[in-house]
Amino acid sequence: MSNDIFPNKFKAALAAKEIQIGCWSALASPISTEVLGLAGFDWLVLDGEHAPNDITTFIPQLMALKGSRSAPVVRVPTNEPVIIKRLLDIGFYNFLIPFVENVEEAVQAVASTRYPPEGIRGVSVSHRANMFGTVPDYFSQSNKNITILVQIESQHGVDNVDAIAATDGVDGIFVGPSDLAAAFGHLGNANHPEVQRAIQHIFERAKAHGKPSGILAPVEADARRYLEWGATFVAVGSDLGVFRSATQKLADSFKK
């Protein structure tokens, strides 16, 4: 059976340093995820860390994005091999790994997504990712088509950014601005000069190692500044944020 799984176009675009504009899907709804996919974003994060998602909610969202130009990226709840294996088996190819602080954690994230001998991913011969055994080249192509994006959002992560960025199999470095701000003692203020310097430093070190960098920036001025600083994959909003803002504006227009 033919398939359109390989090659991974999002992974190729990142490697080519093409600008990739994304959005966050936080409502855990296949309807809202489908709407985001229709909007034309290059990539969408389906959030498993802070949104109420699990395996059973992710599958209908993946189905909703079938045929969309938007590449689904799953943010896993934690850097744990069994969780990552299950998300691979349901059909994710692009992974955002939160709270990576050192090279050992980066290596573990990569290994969790690779079949032996390159990694430790468990083997099932029939699952959703290989169209239930109907993709003949799945096992030969899977390892080279997985995207690993690691999130730096702590002081230790910043201190170890060079080693993390140099890790084989890491495709990009993503900044978690809110947790990074908290780690630097500026909870709720990612625009504090100290945090901004750290963000710019991460972008610069990623570039020095030939890796693209990204960030979540729902404020347009922030997003444009980060693009100017060299970030190439930027999430510029979320379904939850857009929905809350638009509904509040609508209510206010009639109640004030």
Curated annotation (Swiss-Prot):
Binding site for substrate: 151, 178-179
Enzymatic reactions: 5-dehydro-4-deoxy-D-glucarate = 2-hydroxy-3-oxopropanoate + pyruvate; 2-dehydro-3-deoxy-D-glucarate = 2-hydroxy-3-oxopropanoate + pyruvate
GO molecular function: 2-dehydro-3-deoxyglucarate aldolase activity; magnesium ion binding
EC number assigned by the record: 4.1.2.20
One of the record's GO cellular component terms: cytoplasm
Active site residues per record: 50 (proton acceptor)
Subunit relationships: Homohexamer; trimer of dimers.
Protein name: 5-keto-4-deoxy-D-glucarate aldolase
Organism name: Enterobacter sp. (strain 638)
Gene: garL
